Swiss-Prot record:
Localization: Cell membrane
Catalyzed reaction equations: Na(+)(in) + 2 H(+)(out) = Na(+)(out) + 2 H(+)(in)
Molecular function terms from GO: sodium:proton antiporter activity
NCBIfam families for this protein: NhaA
Chief localisation class: membrane
GO CC list: plasma membrane
Transmembrane segments: 32-52, 73-93, 111-131, 140-160, 170-190, 193-213, 219-239, 243-263, 284-304, 316-336, 349-369, 383-403
Keywords assigned: Antiport, Cell membrane, Ion transport, Membrane, Sodium, Sodium transport, Transmembrane, Transmembrane helix, Transport
GO biological process: regulation of pH
Pfam families assigned to the protein according to its UniProt record, in alphabetical order: Na_H_antiport_1
Full protein name: Na(+)/H(+) antiporter NhaA 1
Entry's family note: Belongs to the NhaA Na(+)/H(+) (TC 2.A.33) antiporter family.
Gene: nhaA1
Chain's role: Na(+)/H(+) antiporter that extrudes sodium in exchange for external protons.
Length: 429
């Protein structure tokens, strides 16, 4: 008889009921965001390819903001530098909470999505680089490294309604880790001229913000100015301003201190802030950025062919569709192979393949990195946008085919996960 301590770890095992309910709420918000993102993308593409495309370009180029603070930015810059800072703030809160108080505080559960995210970043970057060694577009190597969680979950909402919660959680965590890795890449690889003085000065409001939230201060009139000042100084330093969103998120405590009653007294400020800011991120920040970045003049089938003949666009398509699938699937398999773990009962490796394909739905962060690599509005950036859109649609269709084949098995698992024959609070399983 096996010692309980030596029982094999199961990949994608069900988490706690409380964590399952929390994740379900997040997934609902992200699915709504995905619908808005798709609508914004269609609107932008339609406008950019209409006889009134000039008005779209004029709108994006409109400057506003305090010039004295060097913040007289265009609408497109505000969307990329300002609104996406909110998106990364929420992503940072979610990631910190998962690893401090969620099911992923258990290293045996955290290793799979973290390793899969790393593989899903490394392999696309390598494939893109190999295709662009001599094309002059090597600077865009990071474009196919990101997964768009809102877009991916909107696909799941249509084709995988009964997908086991553990698989949804895996995809969510993978995408969040993916986004945080992208922020590190942006900070390191896409920072131009670095101004040390504003960067050092940003430490002051960041430290004040940290001190206040650690003391459980919620007053927006204190915290918001400090957050905005931190963002403005990071922006002035030359580091991409979205980095400020992650730094602020990591400063927020997840658990209550002992002086505030300890973890048993209720959630910390991270969950409070997440509830406040996630709707703004999901319903405003991501869709508006998509509207500002996805509007590219395609020019019919001929224009589509010309765009995809650019090695940069081709590298993006191969990186997202092929590289993501190989990186996520292979890394997950290797973790299972070298740890002796096995899949949860009822699941098969084809399920992991479906999620790996869905990881190739890259949009928001891929478009952002494309703009940073080649400059917004440049011909190559437009080609990259076409590549991102083509790859995302292709990956979504391939994932749909794979996941549809398993819907009957998912329905059986869903029935077991949600059965409540004893009519108590929560399923029997």
């Amino acid at each position: 008889m096996l010692n309980p301590q030596t029982r094999r770890v199961r990949l994608f095992a069900r988490g706690s009921w409380a964590e399952t309910r929390r994740i379900a709420g997040i997934l609902r918000d992200e699915t709504i965001s995905g619908g808005l993102l798709l609508a914004a993308t269609v609107l932008a593409l339609g406008w950019a390819n209409s006889p009134w495309s000039g008005t779209y370009d004029s709108l994006l180029a409109t400057d506003f903001g305090p010039a004295a603070l060097h913040l007289d930015l265009s609408v497109q810059q505000w969307a990329a530098d300002g609104l996406l800072a909110i998106f990364f703030f929420v992503a940072g809160l979610e990631l910190k909470r998962e690893f401090v108080a969620g099911d992923l505080r258990d290293p045996s559960r955290a290793v799979v999505p973290v390793a899969a995210a790393a593989g899903g970043v490394a392999v696309p970057a390598v494939l893109y680089s190999l295709l662009n060694l001599h094309s002059g577009a090597l600077r865009g190597w990071a474009i196919p490294t990101a997964t768009d969680i809102a877009f991916a979950l909107s696909v799941l909402a249509v084709v995988g309604r009964c997908l086991p919660t553990a698989l949804r959680t895996f995809l969510l965590t993978l995408a969040v880790v993916d986004d945080l890795l992208a922020i590190v890449i942006i900070a390191v690889a896409y920072t131009g001229e670095l101004s040390v003085v504003p960067l050092v000065a940003a430490v002051v409001p960041l430290a004040a913000f940290t001190l206040l939230v650690q003391r459980r201060v919620r007053a927006w009139w204190l915290l918001l100015p400090l957050a905005v000042l931190t963002w403005a100084l990071v922006h002035a330093s030359g580091v991409h301003a979205t980095v400020a969103g992650v730094l602020l998120a990591f400063a927020v405590p997840v658990l209550r201190s002992e002086g505030a009653g300890g973890p048993q007294a209720g959630p910390g400020l991270a969950e409070h802030f997440e509830h406040r800011w996630r709707p703004l991120s999901a319903a405003v920040a991501v869709p508006v950025f998509a509207f500002c970045s996805a509007g590219v003049t395609v020019g019919g089938l001929g224009g589509l062919g010309d765009a995809l003949s650019d090695r940069a666009a081709l590298g993006v398509v191969v990186g997202l569709v092929v590289g993501k699938a190989i990186g996520i699937f292979t890394t997950t398999w290797l973790v299972a192979r070298f740890t002796g773990a096995s899949l949860e009962r009822g699941l098969a490796w084809v399920d992991v393949a479906g999620l790996a394909l869905l990881g190739g739905v890259g949009f928001t962060v891929s478009l952002l990195i494309g703009e940073l690599a080649f400059g917004p509005g440049s011909a190559r950036d437009d080609h990259v946008k076409v590549g991102v859109l083509t790859a995302s649609v292709t990956a979504a269709l391939l994932a749909t085919v794979v996941l549809r084949l398993r819907n009957r098995a998912y329905a059986r698992i869903h029935e077991l996960e949600t059965a409540d024959d004893d009519h108590e609070d929560g399923p029997d399983a």
